[in-house]
């Protein structure tokens, strides 16, 4: 229904032949324009998602940890002004959004820091091995998990593992003497660390999300922060 949108958006649709109650029959010229536009749009969103330049898109200075909501869950530069890069990135990268996924709600809601680059700024390579150290006392009321995604499909990577993740809910996850937890990524698990490992696929890129459920104050005030993901020899 026309009442479900605004005049500017409906005008943009009309300019390419999408009008309520009328058939959509683009000619060959318009089909090429629309195909090119879709490809350019996908490439642009991909570049914004995986190699954004704005420092405001990162949790910490000189870090690869990214904000999932660039411009808040409303994707705004300021009240009423859209953050177009933030929206393009997020809706290429994910689907739904609620305030509880972004706002400070100590002990409730969730947070989703994520990364697509190692400590030196290089993209993750499914044929190489990496390590993430989570310092002691991960600040969550409920649980945490590390999940790996295919950067082509943006869905969970499909491997021999039942789930491409390591979680505080999993049995057998090893903890270091100081209480920290090491999570490994790569085609094969380090010896004895199978329960702390997420399998990746040679020839495929990937990204990961650190999911924090019921995040606590040390997360929000940044007195606790995850280590950078380091390429292993």
Enumerate the language-model features and the residues they cover.
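A compositional/structural signature for long, glycine/proline-rich flexible linkers
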Residues: 1-233
